[in-house]
Swiss-Prot record:
Nucleoside triphosphate pyrophosphatase. May have a dual role in cell division arrest and in preventing the incorporation of modified nucleotides into cellular nucleic acids. InterPro entries: ITPase-like_fam, Maf-like. This is Nucleoside triphosphate pyrophosphatase. It is found in: Cytoplasm. Gene3D superfamilies: 3.90.950.10. Keywords: Cytoplasm, Hydrolase, Nucleotide metabolism. The keyword Transmembrane helix does not apply. It is an enzyme of class 3 (hydrolase).
Amino acid sequence: MLLLASASPARLRLLELAQIPHRVRVSGVDESSIENHDPALLVQQLALAKATAVSDGIDADISSVLGCDSLLLFEGEVFGKPQDGEEAAARWRRMAGGSGELLTGHALLVRSGENRLACISTRVHFAAITEEEIQAYVTTGEPLHCAGGFALEGRGASLIAGLEGCYSNVIGLSLPWLRSVLRDSKMDQSASG
């Protein structure tokens, strides 16, 4: 069984759709306390901090703990969740018609003592949208809860022109990566047991 260290409904939904048995325990990590100038390392450090924070005292049936964190790298600037609607609208004015890299850090702590860390990157092409469309989207409140200020699994999907890379990564969890490391960790456990 997997323990997801996240309050993200989107990550939870991905695990449900993939039929990966899981439970959820929110980490409560203060993300602002972790700094790194390298965005790829930052998301991995945040993911590891989240997984580590919930790993103490886990039930015996939990074989691994997963932490994730995402951000958008756009024109060299790191975009996490917007602070308010004004910031979300300002970002969308910049992003409209452009492209950015959605980075998701993954940290899988396996009971055998292994840590699997990865940063998965997906190129996101944003549609050229109008000010009216930006305001309509920001008014929904959806962009305030998502790294980069958009939700591919929600209303934001219509504002995305295309993707290069892992679709589920943009939602917050690379299912191909997770399946691969879970499969590898099961093989390692059966080989050592």
